[in-house]
Amino acid sequence: MEKVHDEGPFYHGTKAKLKIGDYLRAGFASNYDSRVTMNHIYFTTLKDGASFAAQIAAGKAEVPHVYLVEPTGPYENDPNVTDKKFPGNPTRSYRSTAPLKIIAEVTDWVQQPQDKIDSLREKIAARTTNNKSTIIN
């Protein structure tokens, strides 16, 4: 993995209710395409980026959660967003094959408008249905 110089703090957004000391691991279905088993666990230095991911991942009846996490191994820039629409890694998104340790739950994040969440979910679903979405895994 390429050395990344961002040292955090790091956040992960999810629909899972976890406890301090738990570990997030790769090897589960993608939140965006259930046909894909993820080889990496993703995280960001942007708290509101993690919260948006959690809100998109969470079902309508599920509560999104944002956690302060600590990588337990090497990590790299997320190739799904790095050097795509914009040069570099403006989303400050990373991924690792090593687990992320839950340090704390974060509650001071921005709730996105439901229509924005629904719109992005619909776009993801349409791209997945039409096989136009590819996760670099």
Regions found by a protein language model. Name each.
Residues M1-I41, Q55-I56:
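ADP-ribose/NAD+-binding catalytic cleft of ART/PARP-like enzymes
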Residues H5, G13-K15, D22-Y23, K60-N137:
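Active-site and NAD+-binding cores of ADP-ribose-processing enzymes
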Residues F43-T45:
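Conserved aromatic
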Residues K47-A61:
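Short active-site loop/helix that positions an aromatic residue
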